Amino acid sequence: MGMITYSDEDLLSLSGIQHFAFCERQWALIHVEHQWAENVKTVEGQQLHERVDDPYFTEIRHDVKAVRSTPLVSRRLGLYGIADVIEYISNPESESAIEIRIVEYKRGKPKSDDRDEVQLCAQAMCLEQMLETNIVHGFLFYGETRRRHLVEFNEGLRGRVRHLSEKMHDFFEKGITPLATKGKKCNNCSLKDLCLPSLGKNPRKATSYVSSLVKEMEEAITGDLMV
């Protein structure tokens, strides 16, 4: 079986792999059903990115050239997106004489799961294919800690990126939105009110919820007719 390659029409948003790694239902609500809701955290995250999303800004310090907002694409993964910062470091001791590092900016602090690492690794894999090079690690910069955190792009992480990207394409092609599963991660999710995780997979809860909505609508209509 040959390697799968995706056409331009089939490319999915690279940033979506972070949503997918966190919650497959959240990703589907955003990218399959096109629903979105902002909360304080998403707004803060956008503001943090605005400070680095200047495609015309290039900074050179000593032996490091930093380029912002570089477009990325991988037809093997079927993903496209933007790298916050790519650093090109002069290193005469390396085979290529240039070391490449990707830096992704995030609000808050390091997560307990690997969603940020997955997104960063996906960016690196895109850039590797574009430049036909090898990138061994990158950095996550968190707005709360004001520190860079090293991420090694080992085969385990690369394999997870490939698995998640394949699953994303399968869900997107089939229009799949997984059922809600309530957990601690739901508390700060920007889509909580749209997702309704409290209903979960219990059909009785779902039926009761829909029935209550219908009853409210009937009462509202009856009230309007009586005015």
Short names for language-model regions:
Residues 20-22, 105, 141-142, 209:
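Aromatic side chains
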Residues 10-18, 114-115, 177-184:
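Structural motif
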Residues 14-15, 26, 83, 117-121, ...:
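Non-catalytic, well-ordered alpha-helical scaffold segments
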Residues 62-166:
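Mg2+/Mn2+-dependent nuclease catalytic core
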Residues 1-102, 202, 214-215, 222-227:
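Metal-dependent nuclease catalytic cores that hydrolyze phosphodiester bonds in DNA/RNA
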Residues 13, 21, 25, 119, ...:
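Alpha-helical structural motif
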Residues 75-76, 128-227:
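Metal-dependent nuclease catalytic regions and adjoining charged, substrate-binding loops involved
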